[in-house]
Swiss-Prot record:
Residues 3-170 form the Era-type G domain. Residues 11-18 are annotated as: G1. Residues 120-123 are annotated as: G4. It is found in: Cytoplasm; Cell membrane. This is GTPase Era. The keyword Transit peptide does not apply.
Amino acid sequence: MFKSGFITIVGRPNVGKSTLTNLLMGEKLSIVSNKPQTTRNNIQTILTGDDYQMIFVDTPGIHKPKHKLGEYMVNSATDSIKDVDLVLFLSNPCEEVGRGDKFIVEQLKNQKAPVIFVLNKVDESSPEKVAKTLELFSKEYDFAEMIPISAMKAKNTDKLLELMVKYLPEGPKYYPDDMITDVQERFVVAEIVREKALKNLSQEVPHGIAVDVIQMKQDDNGKYNIEVDLICEKASHKGIIIGKNGQTLKKIGSTARYELERFLRAKVNIKIWVKVRKEWRDNTSLLKELGYKKLK
């Protein structure tokens, strides 16, 4: 019997959704950073086994929006819960169930798919706190299963995969065996550059940046020539991104090039231009140009 279905991964910002997706896939497709709200789009990845096919939707963290980009991220995450076959609800060990988690629980009550509660980052907590957290969440919702894991350390993730297969419905193979994502290469390129910017910039700047791939061409020798605009909201941020003698921008470019060459399996030449677009996160037309389509 072949099983298949769509699986959405939800949770507050920075609970490890992208890390878990990347671990299960064995490919770096979702942007990973220690800063919250790094995933902005629902990234669809495909995992095919001998008797199953899982289509993962890695969502932005659900949080109280402060601008139109935030509204897009929250709408995108809550919409992904609808019409799926299985939901993974990720959280971390805690002393009490917070407002963000309670909000997600309320969204879950409006759908019929089974929900597996996944308690991530248990390697960073005591067994007592892990047990207490599982007990707290068991009182909030009738979960199909509850499982503690560490996505970073790959602890108990094999058991999680078994549970996911268990709750998938019988179904067809939606995608070819060798297809691992439905997103375009240009999108992944932009996400890689944005990840490197996040890791090399201060707390004030990162979430005010976006990446627009202006050009992506492969020459006769197979080398990619890529040009991107790194968009920020303030002139002062532009100076921070470039850095003294251009050192910060050079570091973003060199680390991005290394990751891009691994992803594209080819040599890469990348040029990054820093541009100021004031209050772009509240500019609906510009947001749509940058790929955030679900704005009302």
